[in-house]
Design a protein with these regions (language model features):
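Conserved N-terminal alpha-helix of the aminotransferase class I/II PLP-enzyme fold
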Residues: 30, 35-87, 109-116
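Conserved PLP-enzyme active-site core in the AAT-like
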Residues: 7-16, 76-296
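Short loop segments at secondary-structure junctions
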Residues: 30, 218-222, 331-335
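N-terminal glycine-rich, Lys/His-bearing helix-loop that initiates the first secondary-structure elements
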Residues: 1-47, 415-416
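Short, well-ordered beta-strand elements within core beta-sheets of diverse protein domains
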Residues: 266-276, 324-332, 387-391
Length: 416
């Protein structure tokens, strides 16, 4: 099946007891069973079933299964937020003394999380420009995973997933990819060799800014060396499900990172239109980027779909004929960036991406407010930068709105 058909029918089960065509919301904290023996078996992973929503829930389970099918994995674990998913994805296999080698081009919240992990003895080494030689140079006997975003947010660099996965596997370590900005519509990282993929499903998967959530999907292919990953020893018996079995029965359960059934319900609805939304969003973003290049040579436009992008070729090779829904412009000064943002009538000034509506933000003063100057530079964050998450509006209206906002502003030199 093709992408949109698979979204609608690939893992659709409906509700067998009533014939409902939409996944019901099982708004229950716990689940009753006919005998103590049955509940004992569920707790010992000897029988399928639900016991407590902090561990699993039928509505959440339906969302997890649909994302698993979408990403081409063996199992998924849905979390209360994208940050909860990121933390759980990492700390499911890490312990004090372990090290991460990561792309330096990351969402500001991810950088903040890595800083918090230092208190637990987990160190992160950053690599500029996703340079494979630098990944290799920073890898040592303590390295336990590689991490990168498919499309860096907001730098918009594109990771060569296959090349990075091959390097990770040479060192017998897994590659975890954050696919939030690209989504499975553009690329399925597990099919290119990544071992684990996570998404902040609050963004494009949900698509309507009505819930916070994240999800982790495992390929089931990585062979866990219990000397490197001693916590996996008791879960090797689960075969390809070892990683998610450990996660659900350990860190995820014990940190209370569960997704609410209501938010899972919203995500199931949003997921069905991911393909048609992304088609429109990507096309609008490309047209808006070309508009800036054509009419405003005094601003620097960054979008992977432009031939001027350093990552255009790898994006063409890796993506499905489109290049994502985010672009950035450098305006010359923070003052001008604020003037443009404040003059816009259609886009919302919001710290989110992936909505049906166009969203704008000044990352340097918001999302990366806790980042050091070096971290901001490596992430492509400057004081004159505007990030634009393009929506599904008629692109002609967006262009006219940006034109009037740009024309009201005065070019100035940026401070770097």
């Amino acid at each position: 099946m093709k992408f949109n058909t698979a979204l609608l029918h690939g893992d659709f089960q409906g509700e067998p007891n009533t014939g409902a065509t939409t996944t019901p919301v099982y708004q229950s904290s716990a689940f009753a069973h006919e005998s103590a023996e049955k509940l004992e078996k569920i707790f010992h992973n000897q029988a399928p079933g639900y016991s407590y929503t902090r561990i699993s829930n039928p509505t959440v389970d339906a969302f997890e299964k649909r994302v698993t099918a979408l990403e081409g994995g063996v199992a998924s674990v849905a979390c209360a937020s994208g940050m909860a998913a990121l933390y759980n994805a990492f700390c499911n296999i890490l312990r004090s003394g372990d090290e991460i080698v990561s792309s330096a081009s990351l969402y500001g919240g991810s950088i903040d999380l890595f800083r918090d992990l230092e208190a637990f003895g987990i160190t992160t080494h950053y690599v500029e420009n996703n340079d494979l030689a630098a990944f290799e140079a920073k890898t040592n006997e303590h390295t336990r995973l590689y991490f990168a975003e498919t499309i860096g947010n907001p730098r918009l660099d594109v990771t060569d997933i296959t090349a990075l996965a091959n390097l990770a596997h040479e060192h017998q370590i897994p590659l975890i990819i954050d696919n939030t900005v690209a989504t499975a519509f553009l690329v399925k990282p597990l099919s290119l060799g990544a071992d684990i993929v996570m998404n902040s499903s609050s963004k494009y998967i949900n698509g309507h800014s009505n819930s916070i959530s994240g999800i982790i999907t495992d390929s089931g292919r990585f062979k866990w060396d219990v000397e490197k990953y001693p916590g996996m020893a008791d879960f090797k018996k689960f075969g390809p499900f070892a990683y998610t079995a450990k996660l659900r029965n350990g860190l995820f359960r014990n940190t209370g990172a569960c997704l609410s059934p209501q938010n899972a319900f919203y995500n199931c609805i949003g997921l069905e239109t991911l393909g048609i939304r992304m088609e429109r969003i990507c096309d609008n973003a490309a047209e808006l980027a070309r508009f800036f290049v054509r009419e405003y040579p005094d601003v620097t436009v960054n979008y992977p779909g432009l031939e001027s992008s350093p990552w255009h070729e790898i994006a063409k090779k890796q993506f499905r004929d489109r290049f994502g829904g985010i672009l950035t412009i450098r305006t010359g000064s923070k003052k001008r960036a604020f003037e443009i943002i404040n003059a816009l009538k259609l886009p919302l000034i919001i710290s989110n991406i992936g909505d049906t509506k166009t969203l704008v933000i000044h990352p340097e003063s918001t999302l990366n407010v806790h980042s050091t100057p070096e971290e901001k530079r490596d992430a492509g964050v400057f004081d004159d930068l505007i990030r634009i998450s393009v929506g599904i509006e008629d692109v002609e209206d967006l262009i006219e709105d940006f034109r009037q906002a740009m024309d009201q502003s005065k070019p100035e030199k940026s401070e770097e």
